[in-house]
Amino acid sequence: MKRFTAALVFGLVLFGCGGSVPPRYVLERDVGDFRYRRYQHVLDIEVPIEGNAAQGHTASYIRRDPNDQTSIATAFVTVYAHAASLAAEVADSLRSLNSYEMSVQDAGAGYAWMLQGASGDKWLLWVSRERVVKVGAPPGEDVPEDLVDAYMSLYPSDLDEHGRAREGTESAGTSHRASEEAGGEELPASLREGAPR
């Protein structure tokens, strides 16, 4: 009986402490040196995809240094209606941003796209099922590892070392642009291979 009780308690602790998705999709708590500041729900998303409606959720975090200077980091979680082809669609959109250099980076627990702006701003983005997660750094700083780790534990990256969705992930599939270039027929996102039925 003791062994059963111990196993039950261990299971409850293990699964009870797991990374379940927060009700408003972002972490509304302090993370590392950054203190949670505020939440905002947004309808004007950064990567609109035709035929795949989405809503955004953002959280701001603030850090004060010993000289009372403040730094602000941001996390943005966009939730799309479905995951099919999401990684390819987002990658196409990111490649079209002329003001950013894009690369793929090992973020520890998974791969992410790194966007670096001419003004020194840096962002890590990745796709996790039907969600796109974007974590931004204070100007001139690296993206805070604690924030990336916290969000990556909630939203594991679907990306591989080349910045494409790993085979078998829900966000895998060909983008609309790539299908057109390959001579494929124009299909709405909901009818593409891998779309939920």
Regions inferred by a protein language model and the residue ranges of each:
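Sec-dependent signal peptide recognition
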Residues: 2-8
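C-terminal motif of bacterial Sec signal peptides marking the signal peptidase cleavage site
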Residues: 14-16
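Bacterial signal peptide processing site
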Residues: 18-21
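Short Gly/Thr-rich strand-loop-strand
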Residues: 24-53, 83-123, 157-181
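Short, surface-exposed beta-strand/loop micro-motifs that present aromatic residues
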Residues: 56-67, 114-115, 120-127
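A short acidic-to-branched-hydrophobic micro-motif
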Residues: 58-88
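Short, well-ordered beta-strand elements
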Residues: 126, 130-138
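Surface-exposed amphipathic alpha-helical segments
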Residues: 137-197
